Each structure stands twice: as C-alpha cells, then as structure tokens.
C-alpha cells in the first residue's frame, strides 16, 4: 500500500553504513568517505552536490555497477554486496536515454519485459499501462527518432518503470532538456513517483530540481554528506556555510557573539549594531550570519542595520536585485518582488541601509 501523499514510509528501501569507495591509483582517490544514509520506501530522495562530490558513486554502488571498498549496503533489509545487478529489482534512467531509434514507442517500453521472458499478453497490458501513465498512448506506433526530447524522456521512464522495480535510480536525466521542458518534467517526475509508489533516488547538481521534487535531500561535497533534510529545512536551516552557499543565494555577514540565552544569541554586526537571532551554536567568538536575499529590505541610510551604497539595481521581471556595498566592505544582495505599482525609492550611488528580522538569519560557526 502506498502511504498518503506527504507521508513517508518507515520501511527502509536503502540503508548504508560507513559506505566507502576508493579508486586505485597513485595516489588512490577516495570518491566516498564512509557515508551513512537511510532512504525510505516510497520516498523521492535526491543526492545533490557539485561535480565530483560522490553522488553518482552512491548511485552506481546501489545499482551494482561498482563494488564498495568497505561498509554495508542493504535494500529492504537484504545485503546488496553479493547480489548481482540483475537480481536487485532496481532500474536506472541515465542522462542519455539509450532508446532504440528503429523501434516504436511501444516496442521500446516493452523491450526490457521481453528480455525478462514475460508472456506476450503481460507485455501488451503492461506497455499499455505504462504508456497511459506517461501520457504517450497516442504515439505508441511512432518511432522514437520521430518524437521530441521530452517525449523521449517519458519513454525512457516508462521503459524503466515497466518491470515494476522496487527502486528507480535517476542520474541527471533532465540535464539535456531545455529550461521550460525541464521545469515541466520536474512536475511529471514527482507525479510518476507519487502514483507508482516506487522509491526514486535522483542525482543532480541543480538545486531547483532538488527543491521542487524531493521529499528529502542529501547535500554532498568531497565524498561526504553535509546535511540530510526536507527541502524547506535545508533551505531555511543550513547546517554549515557550504550548504547555505550551495542551496539558493545567500549573503554572508561577519558577526561577534556578545551573549547567549538558551537557543538565542545576541550578535554585534560589522556596523556596530546588534541583533538577536536563533542559533544552534552556543559560546562566544566570531560567527558568520547567513541571510537570504528575499528576507532583507532596503531602507533609508539611518533606518536599517547595515549602512552602505546602492551600487546597482538589476531588473529580472518578477523581481529586482539590489546590490549594496556595505560600509564594512561586504557585498550584499537583496531581492524585492515586483508589482505594477512597484517604485524604487533609491537611485544608484545613493546612501541606503539594509534591514532584516533576526528570526530569518542563520548563525553559522566559522
């Protein structure tokens, strides 16, 4: 039974402990440095990070294309370490869809089932079900060389879903699509995952893809997981400076702790003004304050927390980005949503100040 939308199963589809992968060489290359991870059944889970961070290595270990150097890797409680790829009930969708151009849409979708020796009647009904799922029934007899990139993506997904895998791995499958089609496919992928109830493990370097589709995200760098959480938790409460910088746009401000009380901290900013903010870190010393551009506002010079000069205002249609050179030498960007009656009160070169409520500031230990 598929859990209701938004409710995650307690069953672990994938569980890894101290998972490590070292490639031989001079010197050896540690692609994965002892990762612990649990991915729930019926979860859309994303591995997010820059190139070379280890996210695709995890995917290849789960698929069975690589063998870990050490550590454990289980699927629904069964060890995968000695299980060959074809016995894992796992399918993979790659960046290149690897469709057969001389075959029709229906033939491509049914190819894997034929290789498994399924009866023709079962293949026919499953192919019809998959074409309906990805909304491609009207193109069943069209060759895949004659359909669009987005339609090819749907065929590749249908082919991977047809054998009813327990886990579907997706290795940056949207990167070849144009911007508008990519956004549409983000919604499509989440719909497919919800309707099928299959665990999706998605690899990407694109933060928007991760935030849009995922139930949870693992942010990775240098072969390690920096933070695992819901999109909102990771965006609003980054664990460290790397996560705050990689997910969304962020301003970083130096600050000094002057007092702590429970989970709140009083800080002195570079301007000499003070602010109280929630903090996971206790103690004194120098910290970094992370403030999202949309959480700040532009004010007159003597009204805000951080005085400076408005160096630029860039119009983006839906919003305007204001670039401020703060008096302490820090560059600050804030974002204001536009509306038909929006007016910019300040001109380039004018003295201004930046304000933000303490509740939206994230305190990061240096």
UniProtKB/Swiss-Prot annotation:
Entries under InterPro entries matching the protein: AAA+_ATPase, ABC_SmlMolc_Importer, ABC_transporter-like_ATP-bd, ABC_transporter-like_CS, Mo/tungstate-bd_C_term_dom, NA-bd_OB-fold, P-loop_NTPase, PotA-like
Keywords: ATP-binding, Cell inner membrane, Cell membrane, Membrane, Nucleotide-binding, Translocase, Transport
Subcellular location: Cell inner membrane
Protein name: Spermidine/putrescine import ATP-binding protein PotA
Chain segments annotated as coiled-coil in the UniProt record: none
Classification lineage: Bacteria, Pseudomonadati, Pseudomonadota, Alphaproteobacteria, Rhodobacterales
Pfam families xref list: ABC_tran (PF00005), TOBE_2 (PF08402)
Gene this chain is encoded by: potA
S-adenosyl-L-methionine among keywords: no
Membrane topology: Peripheral membrane protein
Residues the entry annotates as binding ATP: 49-56
Ranges of residues in domain ABC transporter: 14-247
Functional summary from the UniProt entry: Part of the ABC transporter complex PotABCD involved in spermidine/putrescine import. Responsible for energy coupling to the transport system.
GO cellular component entries: ATP-binding cassette (ABC) transporter complex
Subunit structure: The complex is composed of two ATP-binding proteins (PotA), two transmembrane proteins (PotB and PotC) and a solute-binding protein (PotD).
Catalyses which reaction(s): ATP + H2O + polyamine-[polyamine-binding protein]Side 1 = ADP + phosphate + polyamineSide 2 + [polyamine-binding protein]Side 1
Protein family (similarity comment): Belongs to the ABC transporter superfamily. Spermidine/putrescine importer (TC 3.A.1.11.1) family.
EC number(s) reported in the record: 7.6.2.11
GO molecular-function term, one example from the UniProt record: ATP hydrolysis activity
């Amino acid at each position: 039974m598929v859990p209701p939308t938004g409710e995650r199963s307690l069953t672990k589809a994938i569980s890894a402990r101290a998972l490590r992968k070292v490639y031989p060489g001079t010197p050896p290359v540690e692609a994965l440095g002892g990762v612990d991870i649990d991915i729930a059944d019926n979860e859309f889970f994303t591995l997010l990070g820059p190139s070379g961070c280890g996210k695709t290595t995890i995917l290849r270990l789960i698929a069975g294309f690589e063998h870990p150097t050490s550590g454990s890797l289980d699927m629904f409680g069964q060890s995968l370490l000695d299980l060959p790829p074809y016995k894992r009930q796992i399918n993979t969708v790659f960046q290149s869809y690897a469709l057969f151009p001389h075959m029709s849409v229906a033939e491509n979708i049914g190819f894997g089932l034929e290789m498994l020796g399924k009866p023709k009647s079962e293949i026919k009904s499953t192919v019809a079900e998959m074409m309906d799922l990805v909304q491609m029934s009207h193109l069943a007899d069209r060759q895949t060389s004659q359909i669009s990139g987005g339609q090819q993506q749907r065929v590749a997904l249908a082919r991977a879903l047809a054998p009813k895998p327990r886990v579907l791995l997706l290795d940056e499958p949207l990167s070849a699509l144009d911007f508008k089609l990519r956004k549409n496919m983000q919604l499509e992928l989440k719909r497919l995952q919800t309707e099928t109830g299959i665990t999706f493990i998605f690899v990407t370097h694109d933060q928007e893809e991760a935030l849009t589709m995922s139930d949870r995200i693992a942010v990775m760098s240098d072969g390690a997981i920096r933070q695992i959480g819901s999109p909102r938790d990771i965006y609003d409460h980054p664990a460290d400076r790397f996560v705050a910088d990689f997910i969304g746009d962020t301003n970083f401000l130096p600050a000094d702790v002057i007092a702590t009380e429970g989970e709140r901290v009083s800080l002195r900013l570079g301007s000499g003004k003070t602010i109280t903010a929630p903090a996971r870190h206790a103690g004194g010393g120098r910290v970094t304050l992370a403030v999202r551009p949309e959480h700040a506002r532009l004010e007159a010079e003597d009204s805000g927390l951080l005085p400076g000069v408005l160096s630029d205002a860039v119009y983006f249609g839906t919003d305007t980005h204001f670039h401020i050179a703060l008096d302490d030498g820090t560059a600050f960007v804030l974002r204001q949503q536009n509306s038909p009656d929006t007016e910019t009160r300040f001109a380039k070169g004018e003295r201004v100040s930046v304000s933000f409520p303490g509740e939206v500031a994230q305190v990061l230990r240096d």
